[in-house]
Amino acid sequence: MNSTTVSRFLLENKTIIAMAMICSFVIILNACTTDADEGFDTASVCPSEGTNIYGMPNRGTFVDERDGQEYRYTTIGNQVWMAQSLNYEATGSFCYDSLPKNCEKYGRLYRGENLDHLCPAGWRMPKSNDYENLLITVDNRMDVLSTGYWENIQDTIYINKCGMSLRAGGFAYLTESRNENNDVSFWTNESDGSDYFFTFYVCYNYMSISSLGHSIETMKYYIRCIKE
């Protein structure tokens, strides 16, 4: 390995270790805190009925005309998000642990290349500020998690009030799948000026946006498209 390759390897592995440490810390912290959902007005922030700014029902389904797959979507504030991770079979994408059932459960894992061409017509890759707005809208609450797919979480605590159904599908480093049931990461289409891209990271009771160590060449993450 040359010095650049070694530095990248160390940075990426530090990132993976840090992700695991954050999960462990937050699990301990959450055991000492109370439910943060007091005063959260689900009906106004992410209503299940009515129509959104696009004239669509606030929650519904659409079909990706490329392969006929149907996806759920949900409205959160002024944003409309896919309520399932993308499962379009693009070159280089794969299922967690290479098991087709995991593509059905979590969607596909993608390299951070040609991201702007992966979402269905009428949808686009989110930027980091799209996820920032999401965090502000839901007040960093975990009402976007799907119950039954997270370790160390009681199904009675978080009930996916906003319908976004985030599942702990982990990620992949090169071809090695990691962290299922613990966390999940999603690509944005936004670079930090190098070949590192910002990602949206979710772990149990913690969400963040960062570009540290998220190389488009080695890391594989999921995609949630947002309505254009």
Give short role names for the model-derived ranges.
Residues M1-E12:
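N-terminal secretory signal peptides that target proteins for export/translocation
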Residues E12-N13, N205:
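General secondary-structure edge motif
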Residues K14-T15, C95:
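Hydrophobic alpha-helical segments with strong N-terminal bias
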Residues T15-I22:
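Sec-dependent signal peptide recognition
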Residues F25:
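Conserved active-site regions of diverse hydrolases
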Residues D35-E228:
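Conserved positions within compact, well-structured domain cores
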